[in-house]
């Protein structure tokens, strides 16, 4: 038995993660639980990734507080550390992906699907369950907050679905109807069913032309 290994009850489906290693076996429903962790390195990489990601966000919040309080040097230290944590998280996620999928990151279509799945889990399962816990413990304001955030995740899921459909159908820079396309570099606006291959003003290529209505 090792710390962070997960064990499952084959009768009720209960899963527990080992925090403190002791002797003997883990039991549930009158029987020994089965160890289901196949690769502990993957588990600790994801824990490290989560920890570094949280630290990065916290340090950025702390940097803004220090900035408001007039401690500019401390703010810079917080921000520098936040940037370091971001890189640590990236390295850990890349290592996890290589270990499990033989590549550092997926392509954009695959990443959009990953985002869709994540947002779906958040709005269907995670936030409703978290809001229920807060409500049961008498934290009505927190329950409402979690519920409202969960509804926002529905919009995120729909946004990613729309983007993936557009990308997969080859219409990232093509539309069935006339639209306004804006150059993200100089702001030139063109109306038509296709984005311009090259901006006539600043000469940036089609990659810098996007739908104006998606920016509003």
Task: Name each model feature, range by range.
Residues 1, 9-11, 19-20:
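Short solvent-exposed loop/turn micro-motifs enriched in small/polar/acidic residues
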Residues 10, 26-29, 184, 200:
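Cys/His/Pro-rich metal-binding microdomains
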Residues 1-4, 38-40:
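Extreme N-terminus of proteins, especially the signal/transit-peptide cleavage junction
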Residues 2-7, 177-181:
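Short structural boundary motif marking the start of a folded domain
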Residues 5-7, 15, 27-34:
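N-terminal alpha-helical targeting/anchoring segments
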């Amino acid at each position: 038995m090792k710390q962070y290994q997960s064990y499952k009850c084959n009768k009720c489906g209960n899963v527990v993660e080992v925090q403190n290693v002791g002797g003997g076996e883990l039991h549930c429903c009158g029987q020994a639980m089965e160890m289901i962790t196949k690769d502990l390195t993957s588990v600790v990489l994801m824990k490290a990734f989560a920890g570094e990601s949280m630290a990065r966000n916290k340090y950025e919040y702390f940097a803004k507080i220090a900035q408001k309080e007039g401690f500019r040097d401390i703010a810079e230290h917080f921000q520098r550390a936040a940037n370091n944590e971001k890189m640590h998280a990236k390295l850990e996620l890349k290592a996890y992906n290589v270990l499990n999928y033989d590549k550092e990151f997926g392509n954009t279509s695959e990443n959009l699907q990953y985002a869709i799945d994540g947002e779906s889990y958040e709005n269907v399962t995670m936030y409703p369950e978290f809001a229920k816990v807060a409500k049961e413990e008498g934290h009505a304001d927190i329950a409402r907050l979690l519920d409202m955030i969960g509804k926002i995740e529905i919009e995120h899921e729909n946004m990613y679905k729309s983007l993936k459909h557009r990308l997969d159908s080859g219409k990232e820079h093509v539309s069935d109807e006339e639209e306004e396309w804006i150059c993200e570099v100089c702001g030139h606006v063109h109306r038509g069913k296709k984005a311009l291959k090259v901006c006539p003003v600043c000469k940036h290529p089609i990659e810098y032309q996007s739908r104006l209505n998606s920016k509003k």
